[in-house]
UniProtKB/Swiss-Prot annotation:
Taxonomic placement: Bacteria, Pseudomonadati, Pseudomonadota, Alphaproteobacteria, Hyphomonadales
Function comment: DNA-dependent RNA polymerase catalyzes the transcription of DNA into RNA using the four ribonucleoside triphosphates as substrates.
Gene3D superfamilies: 2.40.50.100, 2.40.50.150, 3.90.1100.10, 6.10.140.1670, DNA-directed RNA polymerase, beta subunit, external 1 domain (2.30.150.10), DNA-directed RNA polymerase, subunit 2, domain 6 (2.40.270.10), RNA polymerase alpha subunit dimerisation domain (3.90.1800.10)
Name used for this protein in its record: DNA-directed RNA polymerase subunit beta
Superkingdom, natural source: Bacteria
GO cellular component: DNA-directed RNA polymerase complex
Quaternary assembly: The RNAP catalytic core consists of 2 alpha, 1 beta, 1 beta' and 1 omega subunit. When a sigma factor is associated with the core the holoenzyme is formed, which can initiate transcription.
Length: 1378
């Protein structure tokens, strides 16, 4: 395995012992594959399957009008190219989407008046536009109105049949009442349930219950057929001695006969009355030759007839099928001479009389009665007719339009009802509605359950829950839109002259477009992407939610649904889930898990044959897995791949046991297949308590990208995978050589995959200081240098939170575990001044401000520098167009964009009249509505974007921005063209040299072409040479055509982009111009910021200590951070201590390499440098080949040697000790520390080491807030609450008690009146302060008036009376001014 481009630069030493059986899959495949299966965009039209979009069209079309004179049929669909690419959509607040064109045929028929026969009159085919469909970006996200969104996959109950019981809660006796439910993908639910009287009932759509046999009558069975379906029969013949019946051993085993059984042949007693016949005894009786037994007439009493018994002469019925036999009936039958009767085998062989009891409780006896009953339940109040009842019943379960089990539901049904089938494929068939056999099968299973056979289903088993991913969710919403459209089409077909219209006249795409827009815009599963860092993006795309439409609600979800289930193993992470009300309802997919075509989550396993591992990897779902025994990934295996130990830890049907090695059928592929991506990034996860591991995985997602990313010393080996799959770093699309690099772009000349149609140049534009959804900063930096050779999928540029192609969420810092003057009490963190000074945890945040100039009733708003009553100082950062300059440093209250709004004519004040009289001009009639920096914000302007409406002249600033964009495009085009030309001409030279030329340009000699001859011509003239060899000439011609085509395509692409830059923007109605300003804010670490490790150890910074006061090591190095040791034992996250020790060793090894590198710079001995690397890594590690690469590697390792300790397979204690010894450090991991203030050593050694810490998104700068004067609520006139509203702090009930307790009456009075909601009092206080007078009078608070109004609305006339006895005049509350 050769080292990749980035691995050569920094090798991570891996402590894992278990080899990985398969590559880590692409982590966002779930999203991409699902949506591609829905669109089938890259599949040729002929090869498209009936899933996804095509399936939706086929299910809704053909649409026939009411008179059946015409049908609209679906042929195929195509996508056109999207109008704007992803980048342009983000900038212009558009949706990244492609137009959908559907080819439809309108078939018009001639209908014969007399016979009603139809013949085709004409067929009109046409392509119709059916709206735009949002496309997924290659990152697995959607750009909707300029923001990136993710569609989260939903877990829901799989369609199919489920059996359950009430756990004995319904009935007082604690008797189990069994129930079954058939759940379709869409359509009516059918429930079967036993009531307390042991009668089996059905419910349709949870309506009133009916006896289950009503359903069977409605299906067309009669009483005898129903009994035959569920019971076997025995025939009793009358003999001189009694009744004789055949003896079947299986029917009698476990039965206690009430009468003794006598062998009919021998006349001997073979079984006593009241004694249980065991299975063994029944078998022996059969073996002894007992094949018929004799019973008396009493033994028949209480048995049930299987057939009607009728007097054939008179037609008199002695007994109906299902009736119990009684003595008079038996006597009558003997009298009439009936000498054989058929009875049901009830209680024999363990079949209970439940269905026969249900039949007797059912009042219906014919199909029409049963159908009428069902009709009355479904449509109460309507009289049933034969046709209506028949039609309704057919629609409920047998009409594919209204009832769809789906492929999954059919597979699940077949698997549950037939015991033998365990594989999905063998259970699949195409019947999507119910069959009679299904309903009878379900009833048989529920009767078996009642008889104590079989098990009920576990709804939380992952075999019974499935995942709906993006594609399926979109498909369901699209179907809803199409069905709405179908109604409109049917109506329109009736209203127009069908002979003259074309398909597009009938189609109105609005309902479809609206359904799609609604799904992406407001569905609970369409979420604003968490873009804090690359890990949070990946985790968001791999999330599984049980909430959402058709799912659970937080309130209703019980404990069982949220709990970890044995089938989660290798499918859903048992660790990563939110804390709080959503715990267990929102989960994350495990690292290796994938979703199969039926929506079930599968986990990979290696096949084991005869205790030997094979290379074959099989994906199993929870259902399929239940019948195998599966060993763990850490089972000991020798070099030949054979299991060593006689007994192995394994899981059998979800239970952990020990089994013999020969019984093992499968084995886990990797120890980390159990956990999710976030949890697999926690080193020493196996040493952390689960609760803290949960916090650790959640907090990594909140880590803010720092100005300087640094990969962790102690990682798990997953860092590179996350960086690659999140697309935060830039990955090379194909192999090539780096031609040009600057901060903005990388140009690579491709060396493979050179097809005629593709350009031979890859240009990668880097994202510079872009704003993410969470206002963190997205900035990419190139790693590759000019001349570097890169392979496909190599990382050539780092993104936010990545370092040399590895995920880097935080920084490695020197930590000491010791108390320090109470500054680390209760998880507080003491940090050194160095951390702030060296910008270790500084991050950049980018905020976006937007201002729109609208066309108002009074006239258009204007963006301008000319703002009334604003001094020159406030305008210093604005250009002549009134827009802030890029690079300006602004603080709260500064103007970013000057804007004025016309205000209505107002009566002139005397002062204005005076001004008019003196200056003769009208005072300005506009007011200042400029965009200002909000309170609490400050920063540097990094970007300004201006959007103009079509047909409005652009200002200077907009034209300048446009010029810059076009220059960038021009530069890209020129570079691509020059590399194309270089490549083409070098290939042309190879074709020409040494060949025979027939003719050439002027002055060129025919004959063999030498290199010198070519040098004399210009490269353009080379094309004019004609070769004698036809083959060579054809090759030359092909090259020429390919080159011309590439140049044409390049020109077209460039012109298209330029045209997009130059044309106006689509702005909302009434908006003339929009200006967006982006502000970069540098946030340094400060007290109040939240920090955390990867083990759930979180805290808030309490103090920034001067460098000289920090505890220091013997060599004088002060520690960076002091943590409280009491935070470890009770939390049980010991992983952080192991990480600290290991990090300490990594740094020690780095110091050794650093010394070796300094020696190398003096002596230039590469061998010695190599030896120091081998000392650090051990001799098994593969190293780069060239000296330059070795030197670069050593340079990158000076800070510390990174190691990987994979989860559940990480470094052991002896590994850490060995690492510490190599680094020349004490294996205790503790050192003597000295007090920075006194210089005296602390009394005992302290644990010191390097630990990876993250700065979380909860920044004190974004939380702290203070209000001066601000907005008031309209009704209560109290200040608003919250930072967003610039609100105040509530002075609540308890605070009032505190002031009452102090006796501070006046303070309390002003708190509750003038400082809050006494409007008149507020104004008076302001006036008195202006006058310099400090007395004031409190009035009546507005909330008191609100209270009185509310009481009056309840009909209580409350008046406020003065002491003197007269009513106080209520002041009318003044209307709140703007």
């Amino acid at each position: 395995m050769a080292l990749s481009f980035t691995e050569k630069k920094r090798i991570r030493k891996n402590f894992g012992r278990i080899p990985e059986a398969i590559e880590m899959p692409n982590l966002i495949e779930v999203q991409r594959e699902s949506y591609e299966a829905f669109l089938q965009m890259n599949t040729p039209r002929e090869q498209r399957t009936d899933d996804g979009l095509g399936g939706v069209f086929k299910s809704v079309f053909p649409i026939t009008d009411f008179s059946e004179r015409a049908t609209l049929e679906y042929v195929s669909y195509e996508f056109e190219q999207p109008k704007f690419d992803v980048e342009e959509c983000v900038q212009r607040d558009l949706t990244f989407q492609a137009p959908l064109k559907v080819r439809l045929q309108l078939v018009v028929f001639d209908v014969d008046e007399d016979t009603g026969a139809r013949s085709v009159k004409e067929v009109k085919e046409q392509e119709c536009y059916l709206g735009d469909i949002p496309l997924m970006t290659d990152k697995g996200t959607f750009v909707i109105n300029g923001t990136e969104r993710v569609i989260v996959s939903q877990m829901h109950r799989s369609p199919g049949v489920f059996f359950d019981h009430d756990k004995g809660k319904t009935h007082a006796s604690g008797k189990l009442l069994f129930a079954a439910r058939i759940i379709p993908y869409r359509g009516s639910w059918l429930d079967f349930e036993f009531d307390a009287k042991d009668v089996l009932n059905i419910r349709i759509d949870r309506k009133r219950k009916l006896p289950a046999t009503t359903m069977l009558y409605a299906l067309g069975y009669d009483t005898e057929q129903i009994l035959d379906q569920f019971y076997t029969r025995s025939i009793y013949r009358l003999d001189k001695k009694g009744w004789i019946t055949s003896f079947r051993a299986d029917a009698w085993k476990g039965v206690k006969p009430e009468f003794e059984l006598i062998d009919a042949k021998t006349g001997k007693s073979v079984a006593e009355a009241g004694k249980k016949i065991t299975a063994l005894k029944a078998k022996r009786m059969a073996e002894a030759g007992t094949d018929e037994i004799l019973v008396t007439s009493e033994a028949l009493i209480g048995k049930f007839l299987a057939r009607d018994v009728v007097n054939l002469e008179t037609g008199e019925i002695f007994g109906e099928a299902g009736d119990a036999l009684e003595e008079p009936i038996i006597a009558e039958m003997r009298e009439y001479g009936i000498d054989s009767i058929e009875v049901l085998d009830i209680d024999a062989g363990g079949r209970g009389p439940w269905l026969r009891n249900t039949l007797k409780a059912d009042k219906n006896e014919t199909r029409f009665e049963a159908l009428s009953d069902i009709y009355r339940v479904m449509r109460p109040g309507e009289p049933p007719t034969q046709e209506a009842a028949d039609a309704l019943f057919g629609q409920l379960f047998f009409d594919p339009e209204r009832y769809d089990l789906s492929a999954v539901g059919r597979v699940k049904m077949n698997m549950r009802l037939s015991v033998a089938v365990r594989e999905y494929e063998s259970a699949a068939d195409n019947m999507r509605t119910l069959r009679n056999e299904d309903i009878i099968g379900v009833m048989k299973v529920i009767l078996d359950l009642k008889d104590g056979k079989g098990e009920v289903d576990d709804i939380d088993n992952l075999g019974n829950r499935r995942v709906r991913s993006v594609g399926e969710l979109m498909e369901n919403n699209y179907r809803i839109g199409l069905v709405r459209m179908e109604r409109a089409i049917k109506e329109r077909m009736g209203a127009v002259d069908i002979d003259t219209v074309m398909p597009h006249d009938l189609i109105n795409a609005k309902p479809v477009v609206a359904a799609v827009r609604e799904f992406f815009g407001s569905s609970q599963l369409s979420q604003f992407m968490d873009q804090t860092n690359p890990l949070s993006e990946i985790t968001h795309k791999r999330r599984l939610s049980a909430l959402g439409p058709g799912g659970l609600t937080r309130e209703r979800a019980g404990f069982e649904v949220r709990d970890v289930h044995p089938t989660h193993y290798g499918r859903i992470c048992p660790i990563e889930t939110p804390e709080g009300p959503n715990i267990g309802l929102i989960n994350s997919l495990a690292t290796h898990a994938r979703v199969n075509k039926y929506g079930f989550i599968e986990s990979p396993y290696r096949r084991v044959k005869d205790a030997k591992l094979t290379e074959e990897v099989v994906y199993l779902s929870a259902m399929e897995e239940s019948i195998y025994s599966i060993a763990q990934a850490n089972a000991t295996v020798n070099d030949k791949g054979e299991l060593v130990n006689e007994f192995v830890n394994a899981r059998v049907a979800g239970e952990a046991t020990m089994i013999a090695k020969e019984e093992v059928q499968y084995m886990d592929v990797s120890p980390k297949q159990v956990v999710s991506v976030a949890a697999s990034l926690i080193p020493f996860l196996e040493n952390d308590d689960a609760n803290r591991a949960l916090m650790g995985s959640n907090m990594q997602r909140q880590a803010v990208p720092l100005v300087k990313s640094e990969a962790p010393f102690v990682g798990t080996g997953m860092e590179a995978v996350v960086a690659r799959d999140s697309r935060a770093a830039i990955v090379a699309r194909r192999a090539g050589v780096v031609e040009q690099v600057d901060a903005m772009r990388i140009v690579v000349r491709a060396t493979e995959d050179l097809e005629g149609s593709k350009s031979g140049v890859d240009i990668y534009r880097l994202a510079k200081f872009r704003r993410s959804n969470q206002n963190s900063c997205i900035n990419q930096r190139p790693i590759a240098k000019v001349g570097d050779v890169v392979s496909k999928n190599d990382i050539i540029a780092d993104g936010p939170s990545t370092d040399l192609g590895e995920l880097a969420l935080g920084r490695n810092v020197l930590v000491a575990f010791m108390p320090w003057n109470g500054y680390n009490f209760e998880d507080s963190i003491l940090i050194s001044e160095r951390i702030v000074r060296d910008d270790v945890f500084t991050s950049i945040h980018i905020e976006e401000f937007e201002v729109a100039a609208r066309d108002t009733k009074l006239g258009p708003e204007e963006i301008t520098r000319d703002i009334p009553n604003v001094g020159e100082e406030a305008l210093r950062n604005l250009d002549e167009a009134g827009i802030v300059a890029v690079g300006a440093e602004v603080k709260a209250g500064d103007i970013l964009v000057g804007k004025v709004t016309p205000k209505g004519e107002s009566p002139m004040t005397p002062e204005e009249k005076l001004l008019r009289a003196i200056f003769g001009e009208k005072a300005s009639d506009v007011r200042d509505t400029s965009l200002r920096v909000p309170p609490g914000d400050a920063g540097t302007v990094v970007d300004v974007r201006i959007f103009n409406r079509h047909g409005i002249d652009k200002d200077q600033r907009a034209l300048q921005i446009e010029r810059e964009q076009i220059e960038k495009l021009q530069e890209d085009k020129e570079d691509e063209q020059s590399i194309l030309e270089r490549n083409t001409y070098s290939r042309l030279r190879d074709i020409l040299i040494g060949k025979d030329a027939a003719t050439g340009p002027k002055g060129f000699k025919a004959g063999k072409i030498a290199e010198a001859a070519l040098e004399e011509l210009t490269q353009r003239q080379w094309w004019e040479i004609e070769l004698k060899s036809e083959k060579a000439q054809a090759e030359l011609q092909a090259l020429r055509e390919q080159f011309d085509a590439s140049i044409r395509e390049l020109e077209a692409r460039f012109n298209d982009k330029v045209e997009k830059v130059q044309r106006g923007d689509d702005l909302p109605p009434g908006v003339m111009k929009v200006v967006k300003v982006f502000l970069a804010v540098k946030r340094k670490l400060q007290p109040g910021d939240k920090m955390a490790g990867r083990h759930g150890n979180k805290g808030v910074i309490s103090k920034i200590n001067p460098l000289e006061d920090m505890p220091f090591l013997e060599d004088g190095t002060p520690v960076d951070i002091v943590l409280n040791p009491l935070g470890v034992p009770s939390r049980m996250n010991v992983g952080q201590i192991l990480e600290t020790h290991t990090g300490w060793a990594c740094r020690g090894l780095g110091n050794i390499i650093d010394k070796a590198l300094e020696e190398f710079h003096q002596k230039h001995d590469v061998a010695a440098l190599k030896a120091s690397l081998t000392h650090a890594y051990g001799d098994k590690q593969e190293m780069p080949e060239t000296d330059a690469e070795i030197i670069e590697l050593a340079g990158n390792l000076r800070g510390g040697v990174p190691i990987a300790t994979p989860v559940f397979d990480g470094a052991r204690e002896e590994d850490i000790n060995d690492l510490l010894t190599r680094a020349g450090l004490d294996t205790s991991g503790q050192v003597r520390l000295f007090d920075g203030r006194t210089g005296v050593a602390f009394t005992r050694p302290v644990t010191v080491g390097y630990k990876y810490l993250l700065k979380l998104h909860h920044l004190v700068d974004e939380k702290i807030h203070a209000r001066s004067t601000g907005p008031y609520s309209l009704v209560t006139q109290q200040p608003l609450g919250g930072k967003a509203q610039f609100g105040g702090q509530r002075f609540g009930e308890m605070e009032v008690w505190a002031l009452e307790a102090y006796g501070a009456a006046y303070t309390l009075q002003e708190m509750l009146t003038v400082k809050s909601d006494d409007t008149a009092g507020r104004a008076k206080v302001y006036e008195s302060i202006v006058r310099g007078d400090d007395s004031f009078e409190a009035g009546i608070p507005e909330s008191f008036n609100v209270l009185i109004k509310e009481m009056r609305s309840l009909g209580l006339n409350v008046e406020l009376l003065e002491d003197r006895g007269g009513a106080i005049e209520e002041e009318e509350a003044p209307v709140a001014a703007e």
